[in-house]
C-alpha cells in the first residue's frame, strides 16, 4: 500500500489526520489529544496552539518539527523514530513527557513547562532551556554538555550522575546542582 504524501497543507481546528507523510505542513488550533500518530511522518511541520496530549507516537518521525503554544502532556518521544529526530518547542506544556534515551542535540525549549519530564540517558548536547520550568524533571546519566540552563529554573541536576562539561548555569540556579548535599544556600 502506497503511503500518502501531503506537502504545504494547512490544517485547521477539528480536521482529523490519516497516517501519511506530512512535509512543510502547518497545524493550527488542532486537538489531537489521545490520538494515535504511530508511523506518521512530520517533516519541517509547524504545530501552532495544538493539543497533542497523550498521543501515541510509536515510530512517529519528527524531523525539524516546530511546536508553538501547544499542549504536549505525557508524550512518549522515546518511542518516536530516532532517524532525524529533531524539533523545537516555544511556549509549550510538556509536563510528564518522556525523552528517555533520545538523541536530541541542539533542541531549543523556550518558555516551556517541563515538570516531571524524563530526560534520563538522553543526549541534550548544545540544547537550550530558555526560561523553562524544570520542577522534578529527571536528569540521570544525561548528556548535558554545552547545554544552556542560564534562564531555566526549578531544576535539580546531579553533576556526578550527568555529563555537564561546558554547560551554562546562572548563579541563581547553582543551588539546583547542589540539592543532593542538603545544604542551605542563602540569597
Language-model segment annotations:
Residues 1-187:
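Tandem repeat scaffolds
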Amino acid at each position: 500500500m502506497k503511503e500518502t504524501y501531503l506537502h504545504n497543507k494547512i490544517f485547521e481546528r477539528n480536521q482529523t489526520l490519516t497516517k501519511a507523510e506530512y512535509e512543510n505542513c502547518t497545524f493550527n488550533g488542532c486537538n489531537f489529544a489521545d490520538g494515535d500518530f504511530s508511523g506518521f511522518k512530520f517533516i519541517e511541520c509547524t504545530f501552532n496552539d495544538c493539543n497533542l496530549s497523550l498521543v501515541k507516537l510509536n515510530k512517529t518521525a519528527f524531523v525539524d518539527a516546530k511546536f508553538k503554544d501547544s499542549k504536549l502532556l505525557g508524550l512518549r518521544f522515546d518511542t518516536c523514530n530516532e532517524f532525524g529526530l529533531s524539533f523545537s518547542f516555544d511556549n509549550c506544556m510538556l509536563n510528564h513527557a518522556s525523552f528517555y534515551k533520545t538523541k536530541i542535540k541542539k533542541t531549543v525549549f523556550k518558555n516551556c513547562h517541563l515538570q516531571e519530564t524524563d530526560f534520563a540517558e538522553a543526549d541534550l548536547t548544545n540544547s537550550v532551556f530558555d526560561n523553562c520550568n524544570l520542577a522534578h524533571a529527571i536528569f540521570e546519566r544525561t548528556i548535558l554538555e554545552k547545554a544552556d540552563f542560564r534562564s531555566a529554573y526549578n531544576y535539580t541536576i546531579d553533576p556526578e550522575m550527568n555529563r555537564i562539561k561546558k554547560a551554562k548555569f546562572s548563579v541563581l540556579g547553582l543551588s539546583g546542582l547542589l540539592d543532593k548535599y542538603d545544604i542551605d544556600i542563602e540569597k
